[in-house]
UniProtKB/Swiss-Prot annotation:
A motif (Bipartite nuclear localization signal) lies at residues 198-216. This is Nucleoprotein. A motif (Unconventional nuclear localization signal) lies at residues 1-18. Late in virus-infected cells, may be cleaved from a 56-kDa protein to a 53-kDa protein by a cellular caspase. This cleavage might be a marker for the onset of apoptosis in infected cells or have a specific function in virus host interaction. The keyword Ligase does not apply. One of its GO terms (molecular function) is structural molecule activity.
């Protein structure tokens, strides 16, 4: 990437810091996850949860959501100004599952947001620790990416369900900051921009007045984030056009959809981070592990190591397959929903199957489900190897735009060849090359046509043994090319409904 000099590393974004060296970054990321762990321990104490109840992923999610809600200032302000029946704007809560007489029971808890904020700050040396909050948002987003399909959202904005591999981070809240922007896929950014443009088309005051000025700044900022994800000059130039448009309308929507399609072959750079549930960090802190002193990284061996030694439970519905539930959570932990299944399977050491074949629904349990009929199971979150998380989109060389990997957005920096039928994708480009962006469109299509399926992504990069923490001996796996590796084939997952 040409602009590497001006970019901050994830960990800097993650911790809001200025330029830091590797040791400082590891320490500040360690401080962040340590704070989450301390907060979680304190909440388990407040709620008098047993060790097993504290390791239940459903309880973890409830507690994470409570603290995120307690710090959601915009929504809190909105709730206070528009009081709705039966909702106390000053309180937050959710379902906590407890073990009673050999059965699981659901208990709804309610806490003052002020109290939750106090506990959170206390666990984070008196600071607001926004980085830790963002970290939990990204974990929830990664879980949603692995659990739900976004076909409906894609179709609503005029995009094609085949673009689902571009939708990483599509459920992240807007307030997730730079660390959140880094992990959003090209499709997610395009969708946010299209929604904005559509509002502008329908509401003439959207771009006007003082509010409109702020809207415009947000629009341009989002355009710049998306531009930064593209790796070819022509794609970047088209983004400049979209950003500079006087009043954005259908022409811009067309351009954005074209760009999203082009990203299926000329992949954008999207960051990947292993964000784990709070119930993993908590017990580690409780056992005396000092994350800040030892240092921690979201993109190296640390999360794999932590999961090797963690025990996490999950409630399981009567007809669900515990192994499938484990796969879902494993993928979420490593942000691997869009990774090639061949690569994930190799790293995990057990076969990772497409979502259409999973006998499991989401991790969260709806309020109308009968918990007493449910059992709990230990999630198998260990791996056979570890690999470095990537932010490149899988392009072989940055000099000339080569093909990224189709229908997946690579998570792990591991050599693989590209199993794709370029014909199927190029078929989506029978579109027009007229209009003001014609030369750029022609250039992009030319690049896509010259992308060779036999190219290899991440040349020479491999996976590592879990004992090889310095990543000295890469093992380059060889993959069977006959089967395409997308998680979304034969998809029958539920839609994500907010």
């Amino acid at each position: 990437m040409a602009s590497q000099g001006t970019k901050r590393s994830y960990e800097q974004m993650e911790t809001g810091g200025e330029r830091q060296n590797a040791t400082e970054i590891r320490a500040s990321v360690g401080r962040m996850v340590g704070g989450i762990g301390r907060f979680y321990i304190q909440m388990c104490t407040e709620l008098k949860l047993s060790d097993q109840e504290g390791r239940l992923i459903q309880n973890s999610i409830t507690i994470e959501r409570m603290v995120l809600s307690a710090f959601d200032e915009r929504r809190n302000r909105y709730l206070e100004e528009h009081p709705s029946a039966g909702k106390d704007p000053k309180k937050t809560g959710g379902p906590i599952y407890r073990r009673r007489d050999g059965k699981w029971v659901r208990e709804l808890i309610l806490y003052d947001k002020e109290e939750i904020r106090r506990i959170w700050r206390q666990a984070n040396n008196g600071e607001d620790a926004t980085a830790g909050l963002t970290h939990m948002m990204i974990w929830h987003s990664n879980l949603n990416d692995a659990t739900y399909q976004r076909t409906r959202a894609l179709v609503r904005t005029g995009m094609d369900p085949r673009m689902c591999s571009l939708m990483q981070g599509s459920t992240l809240p807007r307030r997730s900051g730079a660390a959140g922007a880094a992990i959003k896929g090209v499709g997610t950014m395009v969708m946010e921009l299209i929604r904005m443009i559509k509002r502008g088309i329908n509401d003439r005051n959207f771009w006007r007045g003082e509010n409109g000025r702020r809207t415009r700044i947000a629009y341009e900022r989002m355009c710049n984030i998306l531009k930064g994800k593209f790796q070819t000059a022509a794609q970047k130039a088209m983004m400049d056009q979209v950003r500079e448009s006087r009043n954005p309308g259908n022409a811009e929507i067309e351009d954005l959809i074209f760009l999203a399609r082009s990203a299926l072959i000329l992949r954008g750079s999207v960051a990947h981070k292993s964000c784990l549930p709070a119930c993993v960090y908590g017990p580690a802190v409780a056992s005396g592990y000092d994350f800040e002193r030892e240092g921690y990284s979201l993109v190296g061996i640390d999360p794999f190591r932590l999961l090797q030694n963690s025990q996490v439970f999950s409630l399981i519905r009567p007809k669900e397959n515990p192994a499938h539930k484990s796969q879902l959570v494993w993928m979420a932990c490593h942000s691997a929903a869009f990774e090639d299944l061949r690569v994930s399977s190799f790293i995990r050491g057990t076969r990772v199957i497409p979502r259409g074949q999973l006998s499991t629904r989401g991790v969260q349990i709806a309020s109308n489900e009968n918990v007493e009929a449910m059992d709990s199971t230990t999630l198998e979150l260990r791996s056979r190897y570890w690999a470095i998380r990537t932010r490149s989109g899988g392009n072989t060389n940055q000099q000339r735009a080569s093909a990224g990997q189709i229908s997946v957005q690579p998570t792990f920096s591991v050599q693989r060849n590209l199993p794709f039928e370029r014909v199927t994708i190029m078929a989506a480009f029978k579109g027009n090359t007229e209009g003001r962006t014609s030369d750029m469109r022609t250039e992009i299509i030319r690049m896509m046509e010259s992308a060779r399926p036999e190219d290899v992504s991440f040349q020479g990069r491999g996976v590592f043994e879990l004992s090889d923490e310095k990543a000295t001996n890469p093992i380059v796996p060889s993959f069977d090319m006959s089967n395409e590796g997308s998680y979304f084939f034969g998809d029958n997952a539920e839609e994500y409904d907010n």
